[in-house]
């Protein structure tokens, strides 16, 4: 190694030392001329082309935060929920794409989309860590300004629940004042859930699924079905013979596992910030959220682990 000296190049570029400019480098070009030459060959003039901000509609997104209270912490509360809604939008997009793929018996693309939804849910789980930096005192300062608005009223979350099979006709009521939104939520309620379509897939693959399970009232929550569990039992006992269905089963378990973690972190964050006070939307708050932890989306896939 060459010792430092007059002829040695400068060390780490982050140290503040400056190396002599190599002879082959162009000299520094000041002012407007530098802009014309570009910076690392990057395009710098976007007066006639689409920029990053244009493509992402950043003006609209970054102007969508309107705190109602004078409290500093309300910005965190707003952005936490807005970003969660964006992730839910993507989760719904991917789930619906996976559902279409399952209907068309194209399982590999569905696996990719389901895996992405699980990663989205992991992202949502981690987001609670940011909101949990808000203390009870800080939340109390802004809570009076929230009125009766609550995450309970999120129509994207409701569609996500319905699409995953947790159906409840009463959950249409919070959206009755918005006919356009009500139509979207009702359509998801009345259609087969993702798991319903997977059960139909089992039937198409030759498993004897009870007819009443294949054609039921889609607005009702799912109940455990012995014929569906028997099909999954066969899949798990002979995975090599039913590899695509085996992989589908595990993707669904991954998905529900991530969904449960999201729900759990929601509960613990609420308990940490507001304790056991009533929620702004009128629910019992943390006790209501804890009750939701008992909801099982894909019952046969969990029970079959006991019978194997």
UniProtKB/Swiss-Prot annotation:
Substrate binds at residues 77-81, 139, 143, 280. Residues 1-35 are annotated as: Disordered. GO terms for molecular function: heme binding; metal ion binding; tryptophan 2,3-dioxygenase activity. Residues 17-30 have a biased composition (Low complexity). Keywords: Dioxygenase, Heme, Iron, Metal-binding, Oxidoreductase, Tryptophan catabolism. InterPro entries: Trp/Indoleamine_2_3_dOase-like, Trp_2-3-dOase_bac, Trp_2_3_dOase. Binds 1 heme group per subunit. It catalyses: L-tryptophan + O2 = N-formyl-L-kynurenine. Its EC number is 1.13.11.11. Pathway: Amino-acid degradation; L-tryptophan degradation via kynurenine pathway; L-kynurenine from L-tryptophan: step 1/2. Its cofactor is heme. It comes from the Bacteria. Heme binds at residue 266. One of its GO terms (biological process) is L-tryptophan catabolic process to acetyl-CoA. Belongs to the tryptophan 2,3-dioxygenase family. Homotetramer. Heme-dependent dioxygenase that catalyzes the oxidative cleavage of the L-tryptophan (L-Trp) pyrrole ring and converts L-tryptophan to N-formyl-L-kynurenine. Catalyzes the oxidative cleavage of the indole moiety. This is Tryptophan 2,3-dioxygenase. It comes from Burkholderia ambifaria (strain ATCC BAA-244 / DSM 16087 / CCUG 44356 / LMG 19182 / AMMD) (Burkholderia cepacia (strain AMMD)).
């Amino acid at each position: 190694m060459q010792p430092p000296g007059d002829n040695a190049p400068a060390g780490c570029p982050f140290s503040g030392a400056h190396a002599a400019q190599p002879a082959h480098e162009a000299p520094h070009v000041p002012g407007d001329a530098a802009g014309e030459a570009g910076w690392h060959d990057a395009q710098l003039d976007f007066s006639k082309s689409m920029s990053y901000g244009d493509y992402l509609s950043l003006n609209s997104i970054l102007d969508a935060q309107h705190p109602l209270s004078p409290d500093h912490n309300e910005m965190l509360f707003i952005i936490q929920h807005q970003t969660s809604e964006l992730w839910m939008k993507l989760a719904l997009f991917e789930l619906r794409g996976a559902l279409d793929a399952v209907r068309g018996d194209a399982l590999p693309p569905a696996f990719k989309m389901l895996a992405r939804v699980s990663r989205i849910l992991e992202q949502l789980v981690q987001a609670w860590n940011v909101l949990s930096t808000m203390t009870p005192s800080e939340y109390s300062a802004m809570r009076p300004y929230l009125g009766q608005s609550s995450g309970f009223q999120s129509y994207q979350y409701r569609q996500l629940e319905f699409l995953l099979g947790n159906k409840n006709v009463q959950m249409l009521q919070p959206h009755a004042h918005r006919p356009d939104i009500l139509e979207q939520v009702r359509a998801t309620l009345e259609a087969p859930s993702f798991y319903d379509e997977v059960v139909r897939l089992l039937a198409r693959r030759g498993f004897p699924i009870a007819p009443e399970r294949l054609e039921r009232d889609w607005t009702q929550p799912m109940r455990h079905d012995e014929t569906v569990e028997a099909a999954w039992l066969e899949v798990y006992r002979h995975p090599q013979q039913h590899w695509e269905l085996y992989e589908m089963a595990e993707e669904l378990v991954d998905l529900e596992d991530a969904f449960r973690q999201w729900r759990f972190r929601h509960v613990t964050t609420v308990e940490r910030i507001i304790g056991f006070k009533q929620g702004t939307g009128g629910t019992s708050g943390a006790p209501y959220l804890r009750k939701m932890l008992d909801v099982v989306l894909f019952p046969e896939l969990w029970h079959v682990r006991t019978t194997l």
